[in-house]
Amino acid sequence: LIKLTPYAAKGGCACKIGPHILDAVLKSVQFPTNDHVLTAMGGAEDAGVYVLNEEVGLVQTVDFFTPVVDDPYTFGRIAAANSLSDVYAMGGRPLTALNIVGFPVPLVEAGALTDVLKGAMATLEEAGVVVLGGHSIENETPIFGLAVTGQVQPNKVWRNRGAQVGDALVLTKALGTGIMSTALKGDLFSEGTEAAVASMSMLNKMACEAAKNFTVHACTDITGFSLMGHGSEMASGSDVSLEIETAALPLFPHVVEAAEMGLVPAATYGNRKAITAVSGLVELESVWSDICFDPQTSGGLLLAVPLSETEELVKSLHQAGVHAAKQIGKVVARGDFDVYVR
C-alpha cells in the first residue's frame, strides 16, 4: 500500500511560500502587461483574466502542491478540485487543463502517479474540463496540479474587491482542512478527517453556479493563506472591514478538539505572523486563532452579497448540494483593521 504523505514535509496548500516572503519578491519584479489584461498580478485576485472581446475573457490560473492525503487517487481528485477553484472564484467556467507533475521515479514505477492522474481525470470529467497535455519532472517530493484555462464574460467577472458595507459574508465549505490533515497523519478523529477529505475533493462548481443567480459584489476562495488572509485581501481591496462571527463558522467534526491537542500545521504560524490586520482573536480562546489562520486546501468560496439576498442564496446553495454553506459575518465600514473576529 503506497502512502504519499511521508514524502512531503508539508502537505497541500500548507506548502505555499509565506505571503510576506512572496509579496516582497513580487513587488520587485515588473511583469509585462497590456490593455487586454483585466486582472493579473496586482490586487491578489484568484486568477488572471485576459479580455478577447466584449463577450469573452480568458481566465487563467495554475495550482500545484504536495500530497495532503496518503491515497494517490484521492490526492489527484483533491489537487484537481483545488486547481479549478480559482476559475470558479472569478465566476468563470473552466475549459481546458494541463498536468503539472513532479514525482520520485520509484513511486511512478509503483503505480502511484497513474492513480493520481486517474483521480484527477475523474474530477476534471465531473467539471466538464478536457486535458490537452502536461509536463513532468523527476522530483524527490511528489507534486501535482494543473494549469487551467477557462472563460468568463468580462463584465460579469467576480473580483475579491467590491464588497460593500452592509453585505453579508457567506462561506461555502467548512474550515479546518489543515488541522484535519495533520490529524490524518496520526490516524486521529476519523469522522473529521473523512469529512475534510470529502470537502477537499468537492468542486466549487455547484457553489459558483448557484451564486450566479444572485448579486455577488466580491468573491474569493479560501485556500493556503487562511480565512484571515483571504478575508483581509477582500477587505483591503474593497476599502471596508469584515466582521466574522466564530459561532457561525462551519467546522469539520472534532476540529476544535484537534486544535486543542496541538494538531496545527506549521503554515498556521506563518499565516499568523504575516497577516496582522486582524482584531479580536487575542480575546478569544487560542483554538479560534488556530482555526482562523488554518491553511485551507481546496477550500470554499467566500461571497459578499446583499443582506436581502443572503437567506435565498444559502437556501439555493444547500439545494445544490453545498450543505456547509453559512453566513459567517458581514461587511462594515472601514476601521483600523481588515478583519474583526467576534
Give residue spans per PLM region.
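A generic local secondary-structure boundary/capping motif
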Residues: 37-39, 47-50, 85-88, 121, ...
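Short pre-catalytic strand/loop immediately N-terminal to key active-site residues, enriched for Gly-Thr
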Residues: 73, 191-199, 217-218, 288-293
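Glycine-rich anion-binding loops of enzyme active sites
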Residues: 52-69, 74, 93-189, 329-330
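N-terminal glycine-rich phosphate/pyrophosphate-binding loops that anchor nucleotide-derived ligands
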Residues: 1-89, 164-170, 174, 317, ...
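Active-site glycine-rich loop that binds ribose-phosphate moieties when present
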Residues: 147-157, 191-212, 284-285
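Glycine-/charge-enriched secondary-structure boundary and capping motifs
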Residues: 1-10, 21-24, 105-130, 139-142, ...
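Small-aliphatic-rich amphipathic alpha-helix that forms the alpha element of a beta-alpha
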Residues: 72-98, 115-126, 203-215, 225-234, ...
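Buried hydrophobic positions in well-ordered alpha/beta secondary-structure cores of metabolic enzymes
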Residues: 13, 49, 83, 91, ...
